[in-house]
Design a protein with these regions (language model features):
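Membrane-proximal lumenal/periplasmic loop motifs of glycosylation machinery
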Residues: 1-4, 8-51, 55-66, 109
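Aromatic- and kink-enriched transmembrane "portal" helix at the membrane-lumen/periplasm boundary
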Residues: 35-39, 54, 58-62, 94-118, ...
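Transmembrane-helix motifs of polytopic, lipid-linked glycan transferases
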Residues: 63-84, 122
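Short hydrophobic alpha-helices at membrane interfaces in multi-pass membrane enzymes
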Residues: 88-91, 133-152, 182-186
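Specific aromatic-rich, kink-prone transmembrane helix
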Residues: 115-135, 146-151, 168-169
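Membrane-interface alpha helices of multi-pass inner-membrane proteins
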Residues: 143-158, 169-171, 188-194
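Perimembrane helix-loop-helix junctions
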Residues: 164-192, 196
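Membrane-proximal stem/loop segments at transmembrane-domain junctions that anchor or position
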Residues: 205-267
Length: 267
């Protein structure tokens, strides 16, 4: 239903009813889900309208995302050669990602998680290369530019992506402080370009964007909290009062689903 809400925003003028939150916003776009994803998904469906079928636009998107995901997975398998992983293991992994049904099924979905997954694979490979070279890889301007772009895409394609990037960036800055200037650029540049400059420039061009709920960025923590409260009864009264300030405990426990965090985080 996330993609449904995003497409609804793209094609419907303000005010916009956001079904997940049960709220009407006096804006065409809401950043409850990444606006970058909303613009991409909507553009492909719009392109489908131009050629006479929304299905064609969605099919083209699925095709390109499948190719992008396949390329990311293939690159990661090739990178294992650089790490000295034996060829039989590399080939086995390649075969696994090629024939394990959930992977292609996930890759063809028009949703933020599928797009983020492919981006994150590439980001993670770049991160490992920095660790492998003990920070020296950032000395290459080309590599640094690629890392900044991949970091930015992590930030743009999924709300928790910024947390992953910041935490890992601080680790690099502390561990490889010998290259502190490069690691500082690798940390600051994506934040300036994609967390601040992108919204400042793009949001006014599309008519402004309303702020959504904070729970989208904190979904994992909501899910973990609800799981703990369901499985344990040792939370103190003080802890429960603190939790109640950010989530409805009874609703979260009632809606809790072990497979996805949406029911808990929307409580």
């Amino acid at each position: 239903w996330d993609t449904y809400n995003q497409l609804y925003q793209f094609f419907t003028p303000a005010p916009t009813y956001y079904s997940t939150m049960g709220t009407v916003f006096d804006a065409e776009y809401i950043d409850h889900h990444p606006v970058f994803d909303t613009l991409i998904f909507g553009s492909f469906v719009w392109l489908g309208n131009v050629v006479g079928s929304q299905n064609m636009g969605m099919f083209l998107y699925a095709l390109l995302q499948c190719a992008f995901t396949a390329a990311a997975l293939s690159l990661s398998c090739c990178y294992l050669d650089k790490l000295g992983v034996p060829k039989p293991i590399r080939l086995s992994l390649l075969v696994f990602v090629a024939i394990f049904p959930p992977i292609p099924n996930w890759a063809m979905c028009m949703c933020k998680d599928s797009l983020f997954s492919a981006v994150f694979i590439l980001y993670f490979v770049a991160f490992i290369e920095i660790v492998r070279t003990k920070g020296a890889a950032l000395g290459s301007k080309r590599f640094l530019a690629c890392y900044v772009i991949l970091s930015g895409l992590c930030i743009l394609t999924k709300k928790p992506g910024v947390y992953i990037f910041i935490l890992s960036g601080f680790v690099l800055l502390v561990v490889y402080r010998r290259f502190w200037k490069r690691t500082l650029v690798a940390l600051i540049a994506p934040l300036l370009l994609f967390s601040f400059a992108f919204p400042a420039v793009v949001y006014p061009l599309i008519g402004g964007v309303a702020s959504g709920g904070k729970q989208e960025m904190l979904g994992t923590f909501f899910q973990q909290t609800a799981t703990y409260l369901l499985e344990h009864d040792d939370a103190t009264a003080e802890e429960l009062e603190t939790i109640k300030k950010v989530m409805n405990i009874d609703a979260a426990k009632e809606r809790w689903n072990p497979q996805i965090s949406d029911p808990a985080k929307n409580s």
